[in-house]
Amino acid sequence: ENSSILVVTEGVFGMTGDLGILPEIIELKKEVPFRLLVDDAHGFGTLGHDGSGTGTQLGCQDGVDVYFGTFAKAGALIGAFVASEPNVIAFLKANSRSQIFAKSLPLPIVATARERLKLIRQHPEWREKLWSNTLKLREGLQKIGYNVLPSESPVTPVLTSGSTQLCTDIMRKMREEHGIFVSGVAYPVVPRGVVLIRLIPTAAHNDEHIEKTLNAFEAIKDFVMAAANKLSA
């Protein structure tokens, strides 16, 4: 049955690493006809037995009508793609402003993306390594005393009380004093008075990298906790 309703959600919510409730959303199609578009920027390449994303991980990929992915995360490249039925793709080609007023990806980028798709499928051990690194990082941060939010993906969010200035200071200290890049998120992306530091380990990291990161977080812990306590006082 055709429907003009389009439901849009994420496979992995990039700030917290939570997975979208795709099976529950798809189940609603039995009551209300709609199409489902899933932005799976963080799930593509990292989730599912073959890296094909959150839908595969949750066993409901066939219920996704329009699938959006990017090569900029797991693919370490540039560019993105939309996968759907031929008539949907034809509609997007003719009506998407970003498609009409943009140039195609350079051929070397396309060729590289195709090869990296093959590598993602052929090397499940890379995903195993990714998850091993993710668990080591999370467990280490928790042992130090940081509040690591539950996450079902490699996205590792560390939450603390603090100001926008604290967020900036943490990023600066990690980068300039320890040579580690972290992504800081402050108000209005998160509630006022909250700072979220986001880390995303990769399969290319090793135990030495993780240990260095944990040591750096331990080194700035007193500074972070003092700022958090000052805000809550």
Give the label of every model feature segment.
Residues 1-38:
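Active-site phosphate-binding strand-loop segment of PLP-dependent enzymes
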Residues 100, 176-181, 217-225:
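A common structural junction motif
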Residues 5, 68, 102-103, 147-152, ...:
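Short beta-strand
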Residues 127-138, 142-178, 189, 194, ...:
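Conserved PLP-binding catalytic core of the aspartate aminotransferase-like
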Residues 50, 56-91:
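Active-site PLP attachment segment
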Residues 78-79, 96-105:
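A short glycine-threonine-serine/GTX helix/turn-capping micro-motif
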Residues 12-16, 43-46, 99-100, 159, ...:
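Short, small-residue-enriched loops and turns at beta-alpha junctions
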